[in-house]
Amino acid sequence: ILGSGAEVRDPQRKIVKECGIGMELCREICEEVKEFPISIVFLTNEGDYRIGTEKEVEESIIAEMQLFHVNMTREEVVKTSEYRRAIESVKVVSDFEEIEKAGIPVFKLFMFSHDLELVRRVTKHLEKNPKIAVASSFESNVEITDARAQKGPILKEYIESLGYTMDEVM
C-alpha cells in the first residue's frame, strides 16, 4: 500500500488499484490554499513535483529538511546525501498546468511550514472538503489524499480480494 492508500501493488509490484487525486480535485485544492503562503509538493509515481523557480524549489527543499533536522544549519543541510537526492529527483514546474499536461497521477499532496499556526489554519480549511482526506505525520505538515485513499479501508478491500478477513491479517 503506497501513498497512504492511493496505490496498491501485489507482491510482483503490479498495480492492482489506484486511487489518486484527480486533476480537477488537485486544481480545486490548489485554489483553496492559494491564499496561504505554504509550499505544496505533488507526489507521483514519477517523482515529486514542486511549483516555482529552481531557486524557490531549492529553498523549499531546504526548509522542509530543516523541519526534520532542526539543529542543522542551511549549510549543513545542503551537504547531506538526502538533500542531494531530493534536488536531483525533484521535478520543477512553473505552474499547475504543467503537472496537468504531464497527465501523471497525483497520489498525495504534501504541504509544510515552520509556521505551525499556518499549518493548523490550512488543515482546518481543507478538512471542510469531503472529497479529500487530510492528515499529518508531524505538526508541521499536511498530507492530502483522495477521500477513498485511506490505508485501513484499502487494506481491508485488498485482503478480502485475496480471500482473507481483517481478523486473519491483523
Predicted regions and their residues:
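Alpha-helical substrate-recognition element adjacent to the catalytic core
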Residues: 1-26, 37
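Conserved acidic, metal-coordinating active-site core of Asp-based
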Residues: 32, 36-38, 43-170
